[in-house]
Amino acid sequence: MSVNIPSNSVPSGASRFQVHVINEGHGSGAAMSDSTDPPHYEETSFGDEAQNRLKISFRPGNQECYENFLQTGETAKTDTTFHAYDSHTNTYYLQTFGHNTMDAVPKIEYYRNTGSVSGPKVNRPSLQEIHEQLAKNVAVAPGSADRVANGDGMPGDEQAENKEEDVTGVVKFGWVKGVLVRCMLNIWGVMLFIRLSWIVGEAGIGLGVIIIGLSVVVTTLTGISMSAICTNGVVRGGGAYYLISRSLGPEFGGSIGLIFRFANAVRVAMYVVGFAETVVDLLKESDSMMVDPTNDIRIIGSITVVILLGISVAGMEWEAKAQVILLVILLIGIANFFIGTVIPSNNEKKSRGFFNYQASIFAENFGPSFTEGEGFFSVFAIFFPAATGILAGANISGDLEDPQDAIPRGTMLAIFITTVAYIGVAICVRACVVRDATGSMNDTVVSGMNCNGSAACGLGYDFSRCQHEPCQYGLMNNFQVMSMVSGFGPLITAGIFSATLSSALASLVSAPKVFQALCKDNIFKGLQFFAKGYGKNNEPLRGYFLTFVIAMAFILIAELNVIAPIISNFFLASYALINFSCFHASYAKSPGWRPAYGIYNMWVSLFGAILCCAVMFVINWWAAVITYVIELFLYIYVTYKKPDVNWGSSTQALSYVSALDNALELTTVEDHVKNFRPQCIVLTGGPMTRPALLDITHAFTKNSGLCICCEVFVGPRKLCVKEMNSGMAKKQAWLMKNKIKAFYAAVAADCFRDGVRSLLQASGLGRMKPNTLVIGYKKNWRKAPLSELENYVGIIHDAFDFEIGVVIVRISQGFDISPVLQVQDELEKLEQERLALEAAIKDNDCEEGKGGIRGLFKKAGKLNITKPAPKKDSNISTIQSMHVGEFNQKLVEASAQFKKKQGKGTIDVWWLFDDGGLTLLIPYILTLRKKWKDCKLRIYVGGKINRIEEEKISMASLLSKFRIKFADIHIIGDINIKPNKESWKVFEEMIEPYRLHESHKDLTTAEKLKRESPWKITDAELEAVKEKSYRQVRLNELLQEHSRAANLIVLSLPVARKGSISDLLYMAWLEILTKNLPPVLLVRGNHKNVLTFYS
């Protein structure tokens, strides 16, 4: 027995699932035969409030769950409160697949983009929400887990700010009306009725069919590639631009989008001029010319394009109805032509060259007969625009019900039908009409007259004078041949009107649609004006008027044969990129490339792209060059502007594949000293908190080495991981925004040293592993907790253990500007509050201006709001003064000192110990940078007083072999003498608080002190390394003497032997060594060569 629990019996805070309880008996014979089946789930619909509820069917043995449900409305007994993740309103995921879980079943809503017109974007439960431990006995307020969001994790209460588009009343088309009809009307354009006869007259039947076939090959290959791209995901508005931009990226899409939009606008002019030519021919026959043929074409064309603009502005629904009517007229016209070919010709038609089907005419017209100035490719250039209609359906992709299905089906069928029609008309007209005819019924062959052997002569007409003077009729001279051949001429005229007007109308509609999509993406900032749409169909009215202006300009040319070749290259460029997009997406081997249209091949698409490019140059080489120059210019412009879009293009996919292949290939390359590059881990914390440290490192790694900004989150892993993950993208984005070529990496660890160890061991990839650790000098080492000091010195030891070089950077003001950043954040918050306050005041002013009772109430509100405003301003002023005074302005200036161009000066390199050459290589790389190029290298090395000149010559020889330019070399001969008493006293005072002084105490007391304070400096230790301590103090004296005015000092880092030098003594060495100096880099390589003088 099945019991249906009505929905109103379920508590509002529990579950909205419709539950069907099936056979609740325990082991009874009433058990259903499928009792071993898993729980059954299905989606049901119960009106607006209960869409897509989950129906849970209980199986035998679930009596406890059933009783619990009757009592509490829940499907499981639990003390835990679950969050809601239903697609529409609040609910709990319970008994999913028979278990109490928050896991969500697969739904299409989880995979939609934000603002999708097909439904809302829904967020599934996050991994943390189903993985973390649930807090017990915590009530969840209704609506707290509403997940209908904007795709960025925003809660449901902010949903009002991200309303979905209103799609009610929007006109959408199927594949027949939206694609097939449009493509057929565009392909059966002006060329079918008023140029195809001339084309086959020039090229003959053989080459004419080849011209049609070549065009069909280009369009078919493009159609296949377009179908593959269309079926690789949901297609939105934008047509060819959308396909190319989402496949190859904004650089290609933006450049070709403008060109394609312009080509479509010119295409309107081409069809309107074709229509006007036909009307002018009719006016000639009736002797009703207005001015002259050229100006009449301009007048009629201008009036026509105004009418077409009116239809377009009226909306897509009216335009679609007009297209259907025009197609019916066009089909009648084509049928009328074929009927006319079998109706016996009268004398008037014979005099004009029409003799019905004749084998002699077919044979005579089979070969080409190009007139002066014409050839195969010039004729092809005139015909090819007729084939460009294959994008008519794709160009209105945003107005299709199902673009993924409609575009491939409609486009490929339209290509097939129109190709058959073109070839049929070409063959029929060539088999019936001779090339030249006089139109005079008196030009018959008289008995005994010498015949010239032409087909017309054999059929009783002598048109031989057409060889000496121009004639008005025949395939080569009369553009209205199809009207003459047809059974009823006015129907062909109607067909011409239908073909030309429908094609012009389709182009007039599609060009603004494509342009609107391009402008919405904001790739070209100045074109945002044309992105605005009007009405429920989001009609691009501004784009319509722009297209009208362009079309009007080209209509004034009034010459169809001039206009047609102009757009051929633009359309071919678009086709080439569509084919290349399909090839590129396949070649990139991205898992996201999964087109449902399987009839494609990447190499065929590449062939199609090459064929399009070749045809462009063959048709008109200089026009092809101009097209590519324009496209290249636009490509460079978009690349330079770097639009803020991310479409997952195949260019990005190929970048990944290339990087992966190169990284793998690099692993097979053995290390060589000539290929050494500094690959640095920089312990910056958040990159924005220590910009100076990052700047100096970036100066010697940019374009030549690896730079990884690292941060260690210390604390409970659970909390640290959450904080770390939330800031990853933001910090990497900060690096990109500041044009710093570096990566950001972070780890969570229980202590700082463990985190750095992990980074030193695991950072990098293959050969791109860090070989140098860069850290800032710990300025507060005397005040810092002992654990921090141990960690700091410990990571230096760890780096040496891992055979990684170390660079310690010291500047007088320190690196950390976190306090300044905190103040800036506060200022930004206050500024946002101030702007919001001003907006609220402005809104209240507007409401007050409306008058009435409502305005009276708003007036009081305005007074309450305006009072705190001065207080906010005073707060801002106070914090600004804090920013300048309390937070040291010198710290801000010091943080930017390496961003500035360094003036003329020196980089002093104190290469005291040979570490493999890193101490010399880093300053050399710095001098190659634009900001440091005015700084000269001065080299300081230790030596003996009696051998200064010899050692100077020796060092100069070594540096010249290393090909390192230097300004001067100094040999320091007195480096090992004792420092003066004042300097030594400063050092002794520095270490005094940390000394144990065990030698002045008895043995027992001394041992006790050592156990209690093992970190302190013992007298024994200090005596053992006294000479080294002398050296650090003496070096500072020499640095003060020789390098006080240097822009930068690069100095060999002293190494503390483990177990011999305490952490405090080592930090005292570093302190006294770098005290009161310009910026200092303490460098120690891993003692492996990084310089060589061998080629």
From Swiss-Prot:
Regulation of its activity: Activated following phosphorylation by OXSR1/OSR1 and STK39/SPAK downstream of WNK kinases (WNK1, WNK2, WNK3 or WNK4).
Subcellular location as annotated: Apical cell membrane
Residue numbers carrying Phosphoserine: S57, S87, S116, S126, S144
Annotated phenotype, changing T114A: Loss of interaction with PPP3CB
Principal subcellular localization: membrane
Protein's UniProt keywords contain Ribosomal protein: no
Extracellular side: 195-197, 277-298, 345-375, 435-546, 589-605
One GO BP: potassium ion transport
Modified sites of kind Phosphothreonine: T91, T96, T101, T114
Gene3D superfamilies in UniProt: Amino acid/polyamine transporter I
Glycosylation sites recorded in the entry for this protein: N442, N452
Variant or mutagenesis effect after changing T114D: No effect on interaction with PPP3CB
Keyword DNA repair: no
GO cellular component: apical plasma membrane; cell surface; extracellular exosome
PANTHER family found in the cross-reference section: SOLUTE CARRIER FAMILY 12 MEMBER 1 (PTHR11827:SF93), SOLUTE CARRIER FAMILY 12, CATION COTRANSPORTERS (PTHR11827)
Function of the molecule: Renal sodium, potassium and chloride ion cotransporter that mediates the transepithelial NaCl reabsorption in the thick ascending limb and plays an essential role in the urinary concentration and volume regulation. Electrically silent transporter system.
Protein name: Solute carrier family 12 member 1
Organism lineage string: Eukaryota, Metazoa, Chordata, Craniata, Vertebrata
